[in-house]
Each structure stands twice: as structure tokens, then as C-alpha cells.
Amino acid sequence: MSKKNPGDPRVKKNAFVHKLYTMLHDPALSHLIWWTNRNGEQNTFALCPGKEFADCLTQYFKHGNVASFVRQLHMYGFHKVSDPLPITYPPNGNNNNNNNNKEVPPVWEFKHSSGRFKRGDETSLVYIKRRSSSNHTSGSTIYAEPIYNPLLTNPYNQPQFMYQDYSMGPPVEVQQFYNYQNQPLMYYQQPPGQVPPPPPPSLPPHQQPEMALQYHQYNNYQQPPPAPPAPPPQPGNVLFGYQQVAPPQQPGSTVQQIPANAPPTLDQTQPLSYTPQLEYQQQQYPQPPLPPPPPQLQLQTSPGIPKVNDNLSRPSPNEQHLQFRKIWPDENNEANSKPRNPSLMFDPLLRVNSEGSPKTQPNHSVSLLNNEVRSESSTSSSSTTVTSTALPPPSAIDRSVSLVGGSPFDLSSRMNNQQSFNRTPSISTPPTQNGRLPKISSPLIPSNTESQSPTMVTGTDNDVGVTSKGSTSIISVSKKPSVFSNSLQERLRPSMFEYHPIGNNLSKDVLTIPKISTNSNSGSRTTSQSSMSSASALSSKKSSLSSISSTHGNLSILNSTNYRSTSVGGSGSGPFSTSTSTSTTSPTLSSLLHHPQHEPQNSTIANGTSIRSSISSSQSISSPPLTTTTTTTTTDQRQLSNSPISRQQQQQPNNNTNKKVSVTSLLLPSHSQSQGYAQPLYKSSVIAEEENSTTSSGGGYRSKSDDDTDNMNK
């Protein structure tokens, strides 16, 4: 008991061993744990595992678990003594109790493997230490035998056994081969239980080194790039002879030629290093070698590639009749050609020669800037035909003045918009043919209008052309500022009225040329090919109030539009002034052609048909004198409230900054309007100016300039 004190300072070094030694020398625990005498040496101790011993453990440790205490004994090198020897109980222990309770489980006896844990030898406790996880040599053989596994200590054993399973032969040559290469054999990264079953024993003997070569080459494929040097040829070793075969084939054919008796793990990942061994198989087996597939594929595909190229480069005879719509014009079939709708975002003053519309230019294309009347123009001017095809009208664009065919707006609400137009009976239209629209003509020379869709062109039912013996001219009320370009894009060009908002009152001057003979048999006919304004009774393929030419044959004047023409009585040969009154509507500007002195007749315009309004008498009217009339266009904006475009138009202020002036108006004196000045011929284009106080919204008003020009003519 006196030896307990010297052992106290060493408790911190290995606490468990010193606590165990203290428990063995504690008299209060002598009946639970004590020293035993085995073979005359007191190097063993016994304990009685139970609840009482578990309660005593809490006095020395942080737990009361007997199993944990036994586990700590094993960690420090103690093990059970399994010899069936009689256990000596402590001398002062409860022998009576032990004798009475014979059915108690036997005690556990422990001994240290080194023998240093003895009774009375406390100095030797410093040598007893806890074993680490790597140092298991000090343990008993029960725990040491699974650790010293020969498969783990010798890295060549397990791959060597796997090779024996594959090749069914002795592994001596393989072992020498690895030693010669001086490289350790890589393991297959699969547990040994997943090794496939060995092939049947009828395998020929030459397959054994072959499998060895496969395995070695697979390992070299997994290893880093520095490969071992090629071994010198040895006559006794067959493995090196296999590596010196002809160059390998391409990998595509070698993978397919692996024999069925090869291991599946090698078939799953076949590197390029298997190709020498595969060639050796082809040499060994008597079956004829298969030709390499990649050259066959090249031979099969090589004739096909130039065939595809020939088909691409050499068009088929049916390619001329393709089923897609061409964007270029077809000279052979002009009626079916569909020119593309050109972009509206182009320079309006730039001359564009569109290839999308076939052009038949007239020989009498005269500018608006002519300062004298060319009355020598022949009435037999060449009739220009324009192939009109279905173009989608850009009605979604905010056009201030446009009679776009198929407009989605309700035109019946804008019937009351008026436009008074006074002119002499010098208008007749030639026959129409196949829905073709004429090219624009000069202000001095008439043009033969040919159309089937509603254009506001007055003509006869019998389609009698203008038959004037003398100098005849039809003034085109609707002229663009530039008539130099007669292409489809010029017809789609925005007019001056679309670039600026329109005021309440628009005034335009119309000048007619004397000696116009008109043969009218049964009235006037209104047809349209392009979106024309109500002032398009004069032959013009362009619209002054509308710049969008809808060549689809859309109706500019829809179902609720009334066409009114005055009844002309008798035939006159003197200075006789005849005027027609027409009431049309457009999506944003309503034009009423109304004469102030006559009562109009109403006729409903049908959609998609030739619109005809009868004139009461068929007559031959000749008006020798020159009659200059002033047309006043009045727009009642209260009637435009139903149109979203007109509502936007009403919101725009009528400022002087938005003044609409044509190019030709710059050549006239500024006081010509107020003085009743007879406008020259190039003033015949429609000019929208400031709001004039002399104009009014009533249809029966006649301006001062009208009276002056009539007096001058008389």
C-alpha cells in the first residue's frame, strides 16, 4: 500500500494504467478487482463485471461502462487469459459470499502482453503505453493475424492470382516479366469478388502469354506518360516477340476483333496498346483476316460526296419551276410576278429604279416645272401598262391622308367630310385592261388609264378614249412633288401631306386646257387600281392625298361611300362648264367633289365591282375656252373623330411650322393666291397651305378666284 505514493506523479503520463494500478491496491475494491497468482508470478488481475463494478468505475473515470473499461484494457495491451485455471480470490474477500453464490458468472482475468504490469512494480508502468492504430505488433495474436494479411503485404500476390485465374497457367514468366520491367503491377481497382469466372479449360496454350501482355499493356495505359524502355529481344521469352509485330491497325477494327474469351474488364476499356496483341491473334488463328472497316467506309462514302456536290452545283431541270415566290420579276409571266413591298424608309427625293415592278415608261413624261402649255401634244400618247400584283397595303402606318384599300377603319362615319371641286367637262378615260394601272402622265398630255379596281377616274361605260382633234390636256390634280421616277417605290413614296399634319382647310387650284372634246355615252365610271384620292378623277397612277399605292385591287372607297355626279343636260358647243360631284371618304381625309350649282344624284358603291354612276344625258361636250377653276377642300374634323388616326391628327396643332408647301409653290409669287392670279400649269399639283379665310366648309361656296378666272375666260 505504501507504493501508491511514488506512482502518483506519473498519473498524468498514462493515466489509465496508473488508475488501474491504484484500483488494484484499493482495499475497498478488493472484492471487485484483485491481483491473482498464476504460475508464481503476480502479473495478472481479475475483476467481477457487474453493476457494482460499474458503479465503482465512476470514482476513477468519467463513465461507468464495463465494456468501455475492457476496451481501454485492450488498447493498452491487456488481453484476457483464456486458460481454464482456478481463480484465486482475494484473501480478505468475501469468500463466504462467493461460496454461497456459485451461480455467479466467472470473473475475467487479464494480463499484459509484455509482462511489465506486476504487483509491487510501479516503476514499470511508464513502459506501458497506448497502442496507436498503425502499431498493432504489441497486441495479441487474435488481433494481429487479420492485420498481417499476405495479400496486403505483398503487392504482387493478388494480381498474380488474378492472372492465374485468367490464364490457367503458372505465373512464373509473368513474375519475371514484371521484374524485368522494374514497374509494380497496378491493381484493377475492383474487389476480388467481382473477378469474372475463368474461361473454359480448352483454351489453347498460346493464349497464356497473350493475356499477360494484355494485362501489362493495360497497366501501362493507366500509368503516367514516361514508358519503360523497350526490352531487348530475347529468344526464350515469347512475350517480347509479340510486341515486335507489324504496325497496328486502326482502333476502330481492333476493338471489334477481341476474342470472346477475353476478360470483360479488358473489353470495356480497350486502349490503343492492345493492337499488337490483336494482330498476333489474327496471325495465330487460321480464319482469314477481315479487311479494315475504315478504308471500306472511305470507299463507300467517297463516291457519295462528289455526288452530293454535283447535285448542289448542277441544278436539276425542275429547278426552274420552283414553288417559292421569287422576289425578282419574271419577264415571262408578268401577271403572276409579285414585287416585294419596298421599304418606306427611303429618301423621297432620290430616284429609285425598282426592279420589282416592270416599267413601261411613257415617251411624254413631262415635269411639273414646264412654264408654257404644250398644246401640240398628241392625244394618241402611248398607253402605259403597269403590272399590278397583290401587295399588302401598309395600312397600319399612320398616314395622314391615304385611301388605302382594305383599311380597317370604318369609313361610313366619315362620309360628311367635304371637298368641293370645280372643273370643266374635259375628262374622259380610255378603256381598262386586265387590272393594269397607267404610268403617270404630264399635266399637258392625257394618259390612258387602264384599271379594274376602283380608281376615282371618270370615264364612259363603253370605255371611249379621249378623242380630241386639237391640243388636249388633262390636268392631273394629284401630282407628287417629284414625278421623275415612275417605279413602284415612287408610287409608294410618302407624299407631302403625310409628312405634315393637315389643316382644317386645304385649297388647290386646277387649270384646264381648252378644246377638250369628251365623248360620254352613259355616265362616269369609277374604278381604282391604286389607292387614289377623290380628286383622282383625272388620270393619274399616283395619289396626291395618298402616297401608298395598293396594287392589290383593294377598294379605296368602301361599302358606305356614295358617289355623286351631276346630271348634265344638253350638248353645248360654247363656253360650257360642266362639273361632277363625287363624295368619297378616306381613312383620314374625306374629299367631297361637289359642284355648288347642281343637285347631286346618289348611287351606292359596291365593293369589288366597277362603280358606275349614271349621268342623265349622253353627249359630246366641247369647251373651247380656257377655264381655270379653284378647288377648295374643306375637312370637317368633327366627322373624323371615329378614326384613331384622325384623332391623332386633331391633336396636332395647326402651326405655321407645319405648313405644307410643294416644291413648285416656291416658284410662284406669294401674293398670287389673294389676287386671283391665274396659276401656271406647274401649279396644278395639290398644295396644302395655311388656313385661308376665303374658303369655307359649305359645298356651295364659290371663291373670288373662281369668279375671276371665269370672267377672264369669257
UniProtKB/Swiss-Prot annotation:
Residues 193-207, 223-235, 286-296 have a biased composition (Pro residues). Residues 266-275, 310-321, 354-372, 413-435, 444-461, 599-608 have a biased composition (Polar residues). GO terms for biological process: cellular response to neutral pH; filamentous growth; filamentous growth of a population of unicellular organisms; filamentous growth of a population of unicellular organisms in response to biotic stimulus; filamentous growth of a population of unicellular organisms in response to neutral pH; flocculation; negative regulation of filamentous growth of a population of unicellular organisms; negative regulation of flocculation. One of its GO terms (molecular function) is DNA-binding transcription factor activity. Residues 276-285, 376-389, 574-591, 609-641, 648-658 have a biased composition (Low complexity). Residues 703-714 have a biased composition (Basic and acidic residues). GO terms for cellular component: nuclear chromosome; nucleus. Induction: Induced at high temperature and during human oral epithelium infection. It comes from the Eukaryota. Coiled coil: none annotated. Residues 15-134 bind DNA. Residues 187-467, 565-658, 670-714 are annotated as: Disordered. Pfam families: HSF_DNA-bind. It is found in: Nucleus. Belongs to the HSF family. Transcription factor that plays a role of activator of filamentous growth and which is involved in invasive growth at a high temperature. Required for human oral epithelium colonization and damage. Promotes filamentous growth in EFG1- and FLO8-dependent manners. Antagonizes functions of SFL1. This is Transcription factor SFL2.
